[in-house]
Amino acid sequence: MFLALVRRDLLLIARSPALWLPVMFFVLVAAIFPFAVGPDARLLARIAPGIIWVAALLASLLPVETLLAPDVEDGTIDQLISRGIALELVCAARICAHWLGFAVPLLAALPVAGVLLGLDGDAGTRLGIALLLGTPALASLAVVAAALTAGLKGGGALAGLIVLPLALPVLIFGVGSDVDGAFRLLGAASLVALAIGPFAAAAALKPE
């Protein structure tokens, strides 16, 4: 059932006209920052991890209004509940699909962003590993925020306010991925977020 739910969610993402929006945003941020920072290649390479992590966080939030709100509004969530499917399973599948839909394209686009920001090969590899370990936490936080704001007007803005402070530890560990233990901390943060996220999102979606 879990795989069927993930497949359904991925098909919905693939049919969305905004499919490429997160990765386009990610690359555009990487392309624009060199103009803002100036010609100092060393400075640009030094701040590149922070730029890429902030871009990844914001990219994870771009589709937040479409993660759960449409299913709440059209009754899909109620139908799944009536069929005896646990909301926790639905939310876990949505987290997985959201990660596959935004993080995998971002990882594929990372070499382009790295070239634009002047990252060398070793730094780019470390950053790629850090994103692989840390983006599941961002996906989980985005789905929890989507559940909390489903059905609210302006839910996307509110979801951003919810996620940004909670994502700070992930950004701190991600930017410091050249420090010993940062990868382990990123992995631990993602495991905690993935363990708690489906239950928190399901609790927010359950009818009163």
Q: Language model features by range: what are they?
A:
Residues 48-68:
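Long, hydrophobic alpha-helical segments
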Residues 92-118, 137, 141, 174:
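Hydrophobic alpha-helical transmembrane segments that constitute the membrane-spanning cores
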Residues 37-47, 111-132, 176-185:
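Membrane-interfacial helix-loop-helix connectors in multipass membrane proteins
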Residues 191-208:
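Junction motif at the cytosolic side of a transmembrane helix
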Residues 1-22:
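Aromatic- and glycine-rich beta-strand/loop motifs that create alpha-glucan
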Residues 85-99, 126, 160:
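Membrane-interface alpha-helices at helix entry/exit sites of multi-pass transporters
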Residues 132-164, 205-208:
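A structural motif at transmembrane helix-loop-helix junctions in multipass membrane proteins
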Residues 61-81, 208:
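Transmembrane helix boundary and interhelical loop/hinge segments in multi-pass membrane proteins
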